[in-house]
Design a protein with these regions (language model features):
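Conserved segment of winged-helix/HTH DNA-binding domains
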Residues: 2-30
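Conserved active-site and cofactor/substrate-binding residues in soluble primary-metabolism enzymes
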Residues: 16, 63, 110
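Short terminal or interdomain "cap/linker" segment that borders an active site or interface and mediates
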Residues: 69, 80-82, 89-91, 125-145
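Short, internal active-site loops enriched in acidic
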Residues: 4, 94-97, 134-136
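Non-DNA-binding regulatory cores of transcription-related proteins
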Residues: 102-118, 122-123
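Amphipathic interaction/junction segments at domain boundaries or subunit interfaces
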Residues: 28-107
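Short secondary-structure junctions
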Residues: 72-77, 119-127
C-alpha cells in the first residue's frame, strides 16, 4: 500500500512584514530610522558571514562581493555581482520587500546594512553605497562597493 505524504508550505508574508516594518520605521525621525534599519541589516549580515565562513575571511574583495550576491539571491534578492572600470557592484533584480520598499524607501537601508555586514565578515570593512533602487524608480537595486 502506498502512503501519501502531505506537504504544507507556509504562505510568504514578506510584503506584510515589510509594510509593518516600514510603517514602524516611519514613526522615527528619518536619520534615526535609516541608522536603525542599516544597523539591523549589518548585524544580520555579520551573522550570515560567520555562518558562511566561520573564522575565515575571503582573500579578495571580488570574491567576497560574489559571495554576498549569491547569499542575497538565496534570501530573495535575485542578485549578481559585476565589475567595470575598477568598480564592483551588486545588482539585485528583485526585492523581497516588494511594494513595501517602494512605499517606505528606508527599507533599502536594511539591504545596505546586509551588504556592509557580510563584506565586513568576509573581507573587511567597506563603505557600500546604494546607487540605484526600485524605490527611486530604477529597474534594479545597485550597490557600489
Amino acid at each position: 500500500a502506498k502512503s501519501e505524504i502531505a506537504f504544507e508550505f507556509p504562505a510568504r508574508h514578506d510584503d506584510l512584514m515589510g509594510t509593518l516594518l516600514g510603517r514602524a520605521l516611519a514613526l522615527l525621525p528619518p536619520k534615526e530610522a535609516d541608522r536603525l534599519a542599516e544597523e539591523v541589516g549589518h548585524e544580520y549580515g555579520l551573522h550570515l558571514a560567520a555562518e558562511m565562513a566561520p573564522g575565515d575571511a575571503q582573500r579578495s574583495l571580488h570574491s567576497a562581493v560574489a559571495t554576498v550576491a549569491e547569499t542575497l539571491t538565496s534570501h530573495g534578492f535575485a542578485a549578481h555581482s559585476e565589475g567595470t572600470e575598477g568598480q564592483l557592484r551588486i545588482v539585485s533584480e528583485h526585492c523581497p520587500f516588494g511594494q513595501a520598499a517602494i512605499d517606505h524607501p528606508v527599507l533599502c537601508a536594511i539591504d545596505r546594512g546586509l551588504v556592509r555586514g557580510m563584506l565586513a565578515g568576509l573581507y573587511g570593512e567597506t563603505a557600500p553605497e546604494l546607487t540605484g533602487s526600485f524605490a527611486t524608480g530604477k529597474s534594479a537595486c545597485t550597490t557600489s562597493v
